[in-house]
Amino acid sequence: MDVWINGKFVEAERAEVSAFDAGLQHGVGLFETMHACNGRIFRAHQHVERLAESARMLRMTERLHAEPLVEAAELMLERNKLERARIRLTITGGNLNMLQSTGTSQQDPTILITSQPPTEYPDDFFEKGIGVVFAAGRLSPWTPDAGHKTLNYWSRILALQEAAAQRAGEALWLTPEANIASGCVSNLFIVSDGTLITPPSRHEEPGAALPGITRAAVIELAESMNIPVERRRVPVDDFIGADEAFLTNSSWQVLPVTSVLVRTNAETEEGAEPSIEMRPHSIGEGGVGGTTSDLRSALLACIDRETGDQG
């Protein structure tokens, strides 16, 4: 399997990164995960442009250009003979001394593109939905990297491990005000009284959520289907009381959420100390809702249409 690193295709086992790379030394880096179908990448330019915007805003580099990176990613699909794939584009600060950097770096970044067969998720994920939990930490819209896809994934990995330990498929981040920001690796949508609602991204008021490419596609499709859409804060009670809920990212597309673990007072014997336990609470009727199903079908058709035969 070949990878693309700093302008060259090499075998994955021969790819090299400097021991002084800022991504390795300081965790300074950004990435994009993209979905390829029919040998083409879905909305590749939007992914790369989002990454370039983050690189500028976080003062990593101003010298990223979308077209060469999109071409390199598409060429890699051909070299690795992949019709369907998970594409990962990673950039780091390169050989950067963080203590001497006072503005946007003039150091060339390290750029790595990899491709792999996509993860195959169980059919039950999409036919029955998954359960989620609330992450223990908080996601603030006021931190400099809020809403950017950075390499700083430690807290998210810990939250996902805790979710897996409770047999949940995703952990939801709350803001300091106890509104839902997003999932660890996904954007959240709820459906309430026929309206599609999603927490604001960093482009919309100050939001902590990533402006997801799949999120944007779902919003476009919903509006084309005359489904009302609101981008607003989502308190926990609104999520728990929603008619439907689902998550979006490049790998899942649209993934239904049908339950959430919530804290409840456990029944105890008279005179015993009260205790708290976690119990599943159904979202809506506990099954995949009609709006969720319609939007998933519409998105899959959109992906197939945009990546299909252009000739």
Where are each of the predicted segments found?
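Conserved alpha/beta cores of soluble small-molecule-handling proteins
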Residues: M1-L172, P176-N179, P206-G207, I219-G311
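Feature captures the catalytic cores and cofactor-binding loops of soluble hydro-lyases/lyases
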Residues: G212-A217
